Amino acid sequence: MKFLVIKHVVVEGLGVFEQFCHDAGIEIDTVELEKGDIFPNLEGYTALWIMGGPMNVGDEVEFPWLVEEKAFIRKAVRELNLPYMGVCLGAQLLADALGGEVKPMSATEVGLLPITMTSDGLHHPLMTGLPATLNVLQWHGQEVKQIPAGSKLLASSSHCQVQAYAVGDRAFGLQFHSEVTDATVEDWVKISAYHADLEVTLGSTGADDLKQAVSQHLTAMNSEAKIIFDNFLRIVEGRSR
């Protein structure tokens, strides 16, 4: 089994999912767009994961590879029916590429915040085994306003309606960061846009406060990430729980 992972910036990778892949014997190929890597042929890959980044889906002038990336997503999901997991920007790109709508939020959502499963989410194979409400790491200023036609909304929050959704049976978007590790906050505050969002939302001590909160909840968040990962593998392999 081999996963293709698209990274927009060096510090936003698979996180804890990388260890899960290693433990499961899954090979990982990584494309680093920040370093100028090109999109490869999708032949031979079991699944496509697209991670987060500080850019927005509409920033095609500054980041012209976004146009190619959206076409890449359409080919993977629509033409090849390749299992897909998009995290944060990866979730927004999935929506934008497939006819949904992504817009700026009224206020940036940053912090450790609760999301709640929808009725579809409670019974969906990707979310099986998760609690009805869970605390997750949020760090975004744009959101999916409209999921692609025929998609299912799986989770919501009071600040952002679309926290998780499914396109068909094998493509998923997670607005929240279930890949979080103990190094995530420290790494991400090095990105100027993220640091600014953090201070505006949580104040001058926001980085330290968020690191402490993540540390306190990390075991639970990683356990929930493992549930999502295992469920995704079952979907990829066509197994039921």
Where are these regions (language model features)?
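Short alpha-helical
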Residues: 11-12, 93, 160, 180
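Pocket-forming structural segment of enzyme catalytic cores
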Residues: 98-183
